[in-house]
């Protein structure tokens, strides 16, 4: 039997050099590490890793080739109170594996035990890692490097975006390949999108609880192999990486960036009753935040929390991010529950991972977007991330909905959010683009559901409608659910138009949820993470072409307004913005706080957004000059040239002079 050579301690993972494969694994508390390789018949062969450099275990297997399936058995103490849960009866996934063979099914053998170890061997059913070799012709691919001030983000799910698209070949719908299909690229270009932000594509598992209910984790925020692509989105799992890179290359040729939603805050091992896949059995004490009683700090709501204050875990996370940039040419990341990245355990801007990203010549050059909170005390950190990061701006989301749907927000508060929330983000040299403005996202109501439902309807999730937020700031306009009279449909349409206009013509970086431009509904489900079905798949055959055209016109209008594209904070007298009342006069202090919801926003001295958010038709006197309504607002209801606008209830219009 071939013996392992000592090999070398870097890089982490399994790497083929043309003659064999070098294997490395971090574990600070292991006493022994076995590399387990499996032949074509499934027969297991075990090798002790002979090299031990600091906390890195390593070995080199001569004559090993790509396609080899492997895993690890890690020996060490079973001391739950101290956070140690080693169990060599369980085959473990390499945290840096780039391909996985097998499925993560709900099976008792994939659990290590809670108080006492489960010593039943699981190699026969455990997923295996696969050694891969990386050869890919990027041709002349180059990152679009779209300036932040010109960025329009489109948040989408790989499968849900194209699975029902009638113009995309059936055999590739819902896959990575479909993302790069000319039909999809042309659609994104016509819409005006500059960045496609994808929900997680790193391999994830469905929670055992969901599997028992016949459901699955659809969104993908339950990672199990952070370097491996989720195989279900590939036409062929063996070619997933090339399919993904083909799509990125095609999108780049069209000038569209690709941003990945990535989960560095927890793993699919969940709480101590959850499955054992990898980190818990490799070095539980190092990889996770452990309480004094040996249980996990659950700062994510998912059962465990990755310890990104540990230098080795920071190295792992940094290597993961570099992999996606260097190997797949992605243009940036959106970090789920990103406050975890800065925990020491207190949140700090100079936390190790933030510093590593800032000092990395690769990662410091890509777009970085934080979901700036977690569920721990002190977890709400909006505005507090390092300058390299942009952040999801929930202040904008809530303000836009409250202003147009609940009618309870003063003009001053609305204007503050419209102006990139400078009270939150104008610090440490940050620019307006640091505010990622959104009205909706994958998490919550769709835009159509915001105007059709007062209450969530999550019964299909199997939790008796307890899951999902109750703070939706939605308005069904008098009838719960879809459909209704022509008047009801028109009022809902007007509210959608108002929200889209606020999103796409405000200062900051706009993010549009895929399907909102269609009128997509999830029938009131505001937490559709486990709905891999027609509730979440975009139905292109039912898309509202009028709403899509309205959205595209807004995006193209945005690109004509210097005040929105120059990415500079608005200052008094700089000509970027003037805030006027219904008589075209500057608003008084009282009007800002207590005045009627009527406002004129003059941008770049040529573009005017006239707003009447009251219940009555109101005459709005425009500033001096010859004004004409412009697409998508020009039409029968808005005269071509006017000095006075008859503003309908809850209406708005954009003019140019």
UniProtKB/Swiss-Prot annotation:
Catalysed reaction equations from the record: Hydrolysis of (1->6)-alpha-D-glucosidic linkages to branches with degrees of polymerization of three or four glucose residues in limit dextrin
Span list, region Disordered: 460-479
GO biological process: glycogen catabolic process
Gene Ontology molecular function, alphabetical: glycogen debranching enzyme activity; hydrolase activity, hydrolyzing O-glycosyl compounds
Marked site (Transition state stabilizer) residue numbers: 443
UniProtKB keywords: Carbohydrate metabolism, Glycogen metabolism, Glycosidase, Hydrolase
Statement: the UniProt record of this protein carries the keyword Hydrolase: yes
E.C. number: 3.2.1.196
Domain of life per record: Bacteria
SUPFAM superfamilies in the cross-refs: (Trans)glycosidases, E set domains
Biological pathway: Glycan degradation; glycogen degradation
Record-annotated active site: 336 (nucleophile), 371 (proton donor)
Record function comment: Removes maltotriose and maltotetraose chains that are attached by 1,6-alpha-linkage to the limit dextrin main chain, generating a debranched limit dextrin.
Matches recorded under NCBIfam families: glgX_debranch (TIGR02100), PRK03705.1 (NF002983)
Family statement: Belongs to the glycosyl hydrolase 13 family.
Name of this chain's protein: Glycogen debranching enzyme
Source species of the chain: Escherichia coli (strain UTI89 / UPEC)
């Amino acid at each position: 039997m071939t013996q392992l050579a000592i090999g070398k301690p870097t890089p982490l993972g399994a790497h083929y050099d043309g003659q064999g494969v070098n294997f490395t694994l971090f574990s600070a508390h292991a006493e022994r590490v076995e590399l387990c390789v499996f032949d074509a018949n499934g027969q297991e062969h075990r090798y002790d890793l002979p090299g031990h450099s600091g906390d890195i275990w390593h070995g080199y297997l001569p004559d090993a080739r790509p396609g080899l399936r492997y895993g690890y058995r890690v020996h060490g103490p079973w001391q739950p109170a101290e956070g140690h849960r080693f169990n060599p009866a369980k085959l473990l996934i390499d945290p840096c594996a780039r391909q996985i063979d097998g499925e993560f099914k709900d099976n008792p053998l994939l659990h290590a035990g809670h108080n006492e170890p489960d010593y039943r061997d699981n190699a026969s059913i455990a997923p295996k890692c696969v050694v891969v070799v990386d050869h890919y012709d990027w041709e002349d691919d180059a990152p679009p490097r779209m300036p932040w001030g010109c960025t329009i983000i489109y948040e989408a799910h790989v499968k849900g975006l194209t699975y029902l698209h009638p113009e995309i070949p059936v055999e590739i719908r819902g896959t990575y390949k479909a993302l790069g299909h000319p039909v999809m690229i042309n659609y994104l270009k016509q819409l005006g999108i500059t960045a496609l932000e994808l929900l997680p594509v790193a391999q994830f598992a469905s929670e055992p609880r969901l599997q028992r209910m016949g459901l699955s984790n659809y969104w993908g925020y339950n990672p199990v192999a952070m370097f491996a692509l989720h195989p279900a989105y590939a036409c062929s799992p063996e070619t997933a990486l090339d399919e993904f890179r083909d799509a990125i290359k095609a999108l780049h040729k069209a000038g569209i960036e690709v941003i990945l939603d990535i989960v560095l805050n927890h793993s699919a091992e969940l709480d101590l009753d959850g499955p054992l896949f990898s980190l818990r059995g490799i070095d539980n004490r190092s990889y996770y935040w452990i309480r004094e009683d040996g249980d996990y700090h659950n700062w994510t709501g998912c059962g465990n929390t990755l310890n990104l204050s540990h230098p080795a875990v920071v190295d792992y996370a940094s290597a993961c991010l570099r992999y996606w940039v260097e190997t797949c040419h992605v243009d940036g990341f959106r970090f789920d529950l990103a406050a975890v990245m800065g925990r020491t355990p207190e949140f700090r801007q100079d936390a190790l991972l933030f510093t590593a990203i800032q000092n990395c010549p690769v990662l410091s050059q890509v777009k970085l977007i934080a979901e700036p909170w977690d569920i721990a005390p002190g977890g709400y950190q909006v505005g507090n991330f390092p300058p390299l990061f942009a952040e999801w701006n929930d202040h904008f989301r809530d303000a836009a909905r409250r202003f147009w749907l609940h009618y309870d927000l003063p003009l001053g508060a609305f204007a503050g959010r419209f102006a990139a929330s400078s009270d939150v983000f104008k610090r440490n040299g940050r620019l307006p683009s640091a505010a990622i403005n959104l009205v909706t996202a994958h998490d919550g109501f769709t835009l159509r559901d915001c105007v059709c439902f007062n209450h969530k309807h999550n019964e299909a999730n199997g939790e008796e409608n307890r899951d999902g937020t109750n703070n939706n700031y939605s308005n069904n306009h008098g009838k719960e659910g879809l459909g209704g009279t022509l008047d009801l449909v028109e009022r809902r349409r007007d509210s959608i138009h108002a929200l889209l206009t606020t999103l796409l013509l405000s200062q900051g970086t706009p993010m549009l949820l895929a399907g909102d431009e269609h009128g997509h509904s999830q029938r009131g489900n505001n937490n559709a993470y486990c709905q891999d079905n027609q509730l979440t798949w975009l139905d292109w055959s039912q898309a509202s072409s009028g709403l899509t055209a309205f959205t595209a016109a807004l995006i193209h209008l945005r690109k004509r307004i210097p005040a929105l594209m120059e990415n500079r904070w608005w200052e008094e007298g700089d000509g970027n913005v003037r805030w006027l009342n219904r008589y075209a006069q500057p608003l008084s202090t009282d009007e800002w706080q207590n005045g009627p919801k009527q406002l004129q926003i003059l941008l770049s001295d040529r573009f005017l957004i006239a707003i009447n958010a009251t219940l009555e038709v109101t005459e709005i006197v425009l500033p001096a000059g010859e004004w004409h309504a412009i697409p998508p607002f020009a039409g029968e209801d808005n005269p071509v040239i006017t000095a006075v606008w008859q503003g309908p209830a809850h209406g708005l219009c954009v003019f140019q002079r």
